[in-house]
């Protein structure tokens, strides 16, 4: 029995030592980061700046969707400084809109359930009830490889909390996010 306990103790110590291994690759990555200053920082700085730019002053955003019922973002930031704001939806998948169509519909958070319910029977109008006053803006329904845009007045977003979602039946639970008005 003592030998058995000794083996278990050795195994636990061995596993504990193995759990420390992930720290080693991080230490190995440090020398690689010390590449010549003329190449590495310039290449790294440009994408970081580009990712931060869309917040203020940019009056457009692009949202990508795919065949896995996903948007590539959960937050669209709309600048108050814009007179108009354009959102372009790009479907990066390959399936047609009849089986995996996507759109972007913007409405108040509390109105989205009603927008979904009324849109289910509106296949001919891209799953958006015609003339629905709760809908601030929407794109058309698109399939793989297609894109569609909507343009809205940011002032329409000043009162309340807003969401965007895909109203293709069954997609809204996964494909949604916030629309945030920013300075």
Curated annotation (Swiss-Prot):
Residues where lipid is bound covalently (N-palmitoyl cysteine): 18
Lipidation residue positions, type S-diacylglycerol cysteine: 18
Binding residues annotated for Cu cation, in chain numbering: 102, 166, 171, 175
Gene3D superfamilies registered for this protein in UniProt: Cupredoxins - blue copper proteins (2.60.40.420)
Domain Plastocyanin-like: 57-183
Keywords on record: Cell outer membrane, Copper, Electron transport, Lipoprotein, Membrane, Metal-binding, Palmitate, Signal, Transport
One Pfam assignment: Copper-bind
Subcellular localization: Cell outer membrane
Keyword Electron transport: yes
Chief site of localization: membrane
GO CC annotations on file: cell outer membrane
Signal sequence residues: 1-17
Cofactors demanded by this protein: Cu cation
Annotated membrane topology: Lipid-anchor
Record InterPro entries: Azurin, BlueCu_1, BlueCu_1_BS, Cu-binding_ET, Cupredoxin
Chain spans, region Disordered: 27-51
Molecular function terms from GO: copper ion binding; electron transfer activity
Cofactor mode of binding and number, as noted: Binds 1 copper ion per subunit.
Protein name per UniProt: Outer membrane protein H.8
